[in-house]
């Protein structure tokens, strides 16, 4: 798949988003901030990535996901938990960054902050019914299938 990318921050020309390994599912997104940014515990910041994408094909969407090390080691996660980028969106990708930790975190310019994953999408056609055919699970939820 080819992905149309518009570079909005010239610094990205030297550090284009890339897959870290051949098995990586996500492209690393960088923090296009001009100076180190201190993210205090409990606060959120909207961080520009310096790029825009256009998927164009309604059969795809993009997800902005946290990098595992940022959340586990530093408490830095996404303020919206997952960012959903629709196929027709063409604006700059922004990362809602939340410090859920107990200490301040300094985000440096061009630091890898999140990852972008392209996923297939199926748009469902709603079929209104009065009843469902019975299934083994039925309406059981929230732990109804057991713990182990």
From Swiss-Prot:
GO biological process: dUMP biosynthetic process; dUTP catabolic process
Enzyme class, first EC level, given as a word: hydrolase
Reactions performed catalytically: dUTP + H2O = dUMP + diphosphate + H(+)
Molecular functions (GO terms): dUTP diphosphatase activity; magnesium ion binding
UniProt EC number: 3.6.1.23
Name the UniProt record assigns to this protein: Deoxyuridine 5'-triphosphate nucleotidohydrolase
SUPFAM superfamilies: dUTPase-like (SSF51283)
Domain of life, source organism: Bacteria
Keywords of the record: Hydrolase, Magnesium, Metal-binding, Nucleotide metabolism
Binding site for substrate: 67-69, 80, 84-86, 94
Cofactor(s), by name: Mg(2+)
Family stated for the protein in its record: Belongs to the dUTPase family.
The organism of origin for this protein: Ralstonia pickettii (strain 12J)
Pfam families: dUTPase
Pathway annotation from the record: Pyrimidine metabolism; dUMP biosynthesis; dUMP from dCTP (dUTP route): step 2/2
Cystine connections: none
Secretion signal span: none
Protein's job: This enzyme is involved in nucleotide metabolism: it produces dUMP, the immediate precursor of thymidine nucleotides and it decreases the intracellular concentration of dUTP so that uracil cannot be incorporated into DNA.
CDD domains assigned to the protein according to its UniProt record, in alphabetical order: trimeric_dUTPase (cd07557)
